[in-house]
A protein has these predicted regions:
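Exposed, interaction-prone extracellular/peripheral surfaces
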Residues: 1-170
Length: 170
């Protein structure tokens, strides 16, 4: 018998997080987006089908985490996520510039934002002005709303939900 070897499809992931928040409630809603980004950092490994290569956070400060080895990058990325602060004004243009400079190939650009419609409109404007370059079609804009993020991850079990499952009401 001949065993067919399939090539491993590896994609580089560029994670962009827009930490725009006007109120305390907006800031609290971004906590799930930050946790989602942290989970992506922890799941990224040389053996996975994708590997987190760069992360940019636009909040009170603009932070760019570049690769410096898998373990060092993961540690730096998690530290940046732990220390990031939301803000009513973020460096959106810098975030979009990093997204557009990412190039093509086996690269996935994921932009998590609480204002997806505004981001999509801005990307369309850049495309219409001819400033977008080749990368605009490769940017996935994901809403930071809880309902949207929970489609991709499950929140940790709380004691109440774990207790009701254990109780076995049928």
């Amino acid at each position: 018998m001949v065993r067919e070897q399939r090539p491993v499809r590896r994609a580089e992931l560029l994670l962009l997080l827009d930490l725009y928040a006007e109120s305390q409630a907006d800031r609290q809603q971004l906590e799930l987006a930050i946790s989602f980004a942290a989970a992506l950092c922890l799941q990224s490994s040389p053996q996975s089908a994708w590997q987190l290569q760069r992360m940019c956070l636009a909040g009170e400060q603009y932070v760019r985490v570049e690769p410096a080895g898998v373990a060092a990058f993961r540690e730096s990325a998690l530290k940046a996520l732990a220390e990031c602060q939301a803000a009513p004004q973020t460096q959106l243009d810098q975030l979009l510039a990093d997204a557009l400079r990412s190039g093509r190939g086996r690269r996935v650009v994921l932009l998590i934002t609480p204002r997806p419609a505004g981001i999509r409109h801005r990307l369309q404007t850049l495309t219409a002005e001819g400033q977008s370059g080749p990368g605009v079609s490769g940017i996935t804009v994901l809403s930071a709303e809880q309902g949207e993020l929970l489609r991709y991850c499950l929140p940790p079990d709380t004691g109440a939900s774990a207790g009701s499952k254990a109780g076995g009401v049928s």
